[in-house]
Amino acid sequence: MSPDQLVVEFDRALRTILAPARSMRPLPGAALPDAELPAAQRSHVAGLMRVNHCGEICAQALYQGQALTSRDPTIRDALRSAADEETEHLAWTERRISELGGRKSFLNPLWYLGSLSLGLVAGALGDKWSLGFLAETERQVEAHLNGHLRSLPEDDSRSRAIVDQMRLDEIQHAETAVRYGAAELPSPAKVAMKVMAKVMTGVAYRF
């Protein structure tokens, strides 16, 4: 990697972790009325959205690592395009956390570094395995978001609109990875990913 590329990637990391994210698409549910939630429910929803925001931090780092090690320019461009959509998810979840009076995870820098490392390793294994890891990640995120939709209050239409649009985007990302030749990961790898995700979501919900 050239010094210029190193600066660009470092700037990308800093902006992801520290700078307010921006979205080219409208915020889902922005025109809907905000629900009058009891304090306990607001805290719960803020925790769920913090987990989702943390997940998008991880997605940015994962895509960055995979793009850096991809051998195929077409796949690299697809990863960058998906990362742009994940940036929109960052903006949406950040906005909703603020509306709920919540805060982002204190551990975002650690989540970012860990996910960047995973992305670099996945990419180094070759594009088909890197894409397989990406596809499985997105499938597990979809399942996670389905769980959040079941957990969110029925009248919290704003949060539900954000989570549902994120879910649709993640489905599309998984389908894109498969279209570009993603390999099916072995079952032990899928189980390990689920365990790691469960630890991350549990910690991010609280911290």
Curated annotation (Swiss-Prot):
Cofactor or coenzyme needed: Fe cation
Protein name per UniProt: 3-demethoxyubiquinol 3-hydroxylase
Keywords from the named record: Cell membrane, Iron, Membrane, Metal-binding, Monooxygenase, Oxidoreductase, Ubiquinone biosynthesis
PANTHER family (alphabetical): 5-DEMETHOXYUBIQUINONE HYDROXYLASE, MITOCHONDRIAL, COENZYME Q10 BIOSYNTHESIS PROTEIN 7
A GO molecular function held by the record: 3-demethoxyubiquinol 3-hydroxylase activity
Entry's family note: Belongs to the COQ7 family.
NCBIfam families associated with the record: DMQ_monoox_COQ7
Main EC class the enzyme belongs to: oxidoreductase
Function: Catalyzes the hydroxylation of 2-nonaprenyl-3-methyl-6-methoxy-1,4-benzoquinol during ubiquinone biosynthesis.
Subcellular localization(s) per the UniProt record: Cell membrane
Domain of life: Bacteria
Biochemical pathway: Cofactor biosynthesis; ubiquinone biosynthesis
Cofactor mode of binding and number, as noted: Binds 2 iron ions per subunit.
